Amino acid sequence: MAKEVAGQIKLQIKGGAANPSPPVGPALGAKGINIMEFCKQFNARTQDKAGKVLPVVITYYADKSFDFIVKTPPVAIQLLEASKQKSGSAEPNRKKVAEITWEQVRTIAEDKLVDLNCFDIKAAMKMVAGTARSMGIAIKGDFPE
């Protein structure tokens, strides 16, 4: 028989760096989840992605056990890495902070395709381009056909 799902928690944690301090500790402790066990499992599973911010969805059950799914890094963070910037523009419609190529957009879209709600790479590229535009990152050239 399947376990009864009590709820879900969504967090963004740096890979290989989960510890009981906020935001992890209070979020899990309030639900009665073993914080140290989660931290050990998360750090073991994400040691190859150390330092990258990773979204994680924790499903906890009525018996206080849990499962979690680690997703790919957010598009905004991947765009900042690709453009070698620390943050986006405060005024994205007026001031552009960086410029990237459609090839970089395609690479990010291919990486993120499993987490996006689209099925083809062109739609994913348009989503990534929209995020870039809202961050003040310009894209060189025209959309590839």
From Swiss-Prot:
GO BP annotations listed: translation
Assembly notes: Part of the ribosomal stalk of the 50S ribosomal subunit. Interacts with L10 and the large rRNA to form the base of the stalk. L10 forms an elongated spine to which L12 dimers bind in a sequential fashion forming a multimeric L10(L12)X complex.
Gene Ontology cellular-component terms listed: cytosolic large ribosomal subunit
Family: Belongs to the universal ribosomal protein uL11 family.
SMART domains: RL11 (SM00649)
HAMAP family in the cross-refs: Ribosomal_uL11
UniProt protein name: Large ribosomal subunit protein uL11
Gene: rplK
InterPro entries assigned to the protein according to its UniProt record, in alphabetical order: Ribosomal_uL11, Ribosomal_uL11_bac-typ, Ribosomal_uL11_C, Ribosomal_uL11_C_sf, Ribosomal_uL11_CS, Ribosomal_uL11_N, Ribosomal_uL11_N_sf
PANTHER family per UniProt: 60S RIBOSOMAL PROTEIN L12 (PTHR11661), LARGE RIBOSOMAL SUBUNIT PROTEIN UL11M (PTHR11661:SF1)
Superkingdom as given in the UniProt entry: Bacteria
Keywords recorded for this protein, A-Z: Methylation, Ribonucleoprotein, Ribosomal protein, RNA-binding, rRNA-binding
Organism: Porphyromonas gingivalis (strain ATCC BAA-308 / W83)
Purpose of the protein: Forms part of the ribosomal stalk which helps the ribosome interact with GTP-bound translation factors.
Pfam families xrefs: Ribosomal_L11, Ribosomal_L11_N
A molecular-function term among this protein's GO annotations: structural constituent of ribosome
Post-translational modification: One or more lysine residues are methylated.
